[in-house]
């Protein structure tokens, strides 16, 4: 797996979670942190301008409405190391490790907003996701449709409950994917 000149970009949600209760660090964020530590890359979080509610059913209602409307929620990029310009970091990198949870067999809409907002020509994207039974669903194909000019690698999937509760299993899964 490519790791030189890489950035780990991810979307993750905190609060009440479907399978693991109340969480302070999102499932996908936990996997992103493991990947970043294994390859020595910085992280950048996709943060929606309108945050999802902490209450699970309220977050589901908001996400369902966004998906039904084909919404493209506004977002900001937040660098894990506090860098001032994470967008410039993405412009200068060759490989993007892209993480997201699976919501109804798809990526959350802010991830689509992010993907559609950039020129991906010449970049390599390595997708990874957390889920509770859907695997990657059809998200790798969706990414390939959106990121014209990029190479999209096979993705890695991990159950959110594993990411949240079993660091050793998460590290093994990441190491197996990175090769």
Where are these regions (language model features)?
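N-terminal beta1-alpha1-beta2 submodule of the flavodoxin-like/Rossmannoid cofactor-binding fold
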Residues: 1-95, 105, 112, 116, ...
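Solvent-exposed loop/turn segments at secondary-structure junctions
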Residues: 13-16, 49-51, 102-106, 131-135, ...
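Residues at alpha-helix caps and immediate loop-helix transition turns in enzyme cores, especially N-
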Residues: 107-111, 136-139, 166
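A short helix->loop->beta-strand "cap" motif at the edges of active sites that frequently abuts
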Residues: 121-124, 149-150
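Thiol-based oxidoreductase modules, predominantly thioredoxin-like and allied folds used
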Residues: 128
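Glycine-rich, charge-decorated loop segments at or immediately adjacent to ligand/cofactor-binding or catalytic sites
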Residues: 133-146
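Glycine-rich phosphate/pyrophosphate-binding loop and the adjoining helix
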Residues: 151-179
């Amino acid at each position: 797996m490519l790791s030189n000149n890489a950035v780990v970009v991810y979307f993750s949600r905190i609060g009440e979670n479907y399978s693991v209760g109340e969480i302070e660090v999102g499932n996908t964020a936990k996997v992103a942190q493991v990947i970043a530590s294994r390859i020595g890359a910085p992280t950048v979080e996709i943060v929606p301008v309108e945050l999802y509610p902490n209450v699970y059913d309220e977050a589901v209602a908001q996400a369902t409405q966004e998906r039904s409307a084909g919404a493209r929620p506004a977002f900001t990029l937040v660098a894990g190391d506090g860098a001032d310009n994470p967008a410039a970091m993405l412009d200068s990198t060759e490989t993007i490790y892209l993480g997201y949870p699976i919501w109804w067999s798809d990526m959350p809409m802010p991830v689509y907003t992010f993907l559609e907002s950039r020129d991906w020509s010449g970049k390599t994207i390595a997708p990874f996701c957390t889920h509770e039974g859907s695997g990657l669903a059809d998200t790798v194909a969706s990414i390939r449709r959106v990121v014209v000019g990029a190479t999209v690698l096979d993705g890695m999937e991990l159950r959110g409950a594993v990411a949240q509760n079993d660091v050793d299993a998460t590290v093994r899964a990441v190491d197996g994917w990175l090769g």
